[in-house]
Amino acid sequence: MNDRIIEFEPLIEGILIKRYKRFLADIQIENGEIVTAHCANTGPMKGLLNEGANVRISFSSSTKRKLPWTWEQVKVIGRDNKEVWVGINTLFANKLIRKVIEQNLFKDKLGEIAKIKSEVPYGKDKKSRIDFLLTPKSSNPDNRNIYVEVKNTTWTKNNVALFPDTETKRGQKHLIELKGLIPESKSVLVPCITRKDIDYFAPGDESDPLYGELFRESISAGMLLIPCCFEFHSDHVAWKGFKPLKLN
């Protein structure tokens, strides 16, 4: 299989000047111009906000956008003091996982999939939206609907990817709702690990202890965990496979 899970127009290289107001980042691009880019990741981005860091941004000519530039990637010093590119656009994570599903890479874990729906209302009050609702093929032994929640994961310690990197009430609610779907449906949590320098995934207990508790309760109740790892380049993202869970 070609490990290029998705390809795109080459990104523009630049230098991070600062990130501010959560949604904005000033970046100096190769021609010396300073542009303001949209930052889709509004969290603390632990270990990623080093002023002067190399970054990559994309450009959109859409007239509907307030800002034509989007911050996509940042280069950091990762494991073994080696440089690694990290994908920081949280909106891109769902595109990656959809590609994984469409390329049948979840077959051994979820079986054959007949239909993919995005942003489907679910939960007791139907006010939450699941990232993907999968309908299995009729040939599958388990014909339950599959609810998939994706979490963009950038924070690491040593060789372990961690989510979340801050307290997340929304994430806590998602775990409660995923657990509530069991056993009538399958619940799946997919950490989308947007850097290659890791070997394991674990809940970010240090940042959100309650999330860690709810995570363990959901796993015990039957929620499936499928951490997916990717390597980021200037014109494509490569598939690096599944990573195991590591709990203390």
From Swiss-Prot:
One GO MF term: DNA binding
Coiled-coil residues: none
Pfam entry (one): SfsA
Entries under CDD domains matching the protein: SfsA-like_bacterial (cd22359)
Xref: NCBIfam families: sfsA
Family: Belongs to the SfsA family.
Name the UniProt record assigns to this protein: Sugar fermentation stimulation protein homolog
Organism of derivation: Prochlorococcus marinus subsp. pastoris (strain CCMP1986 / NIES-2087 / MED4)
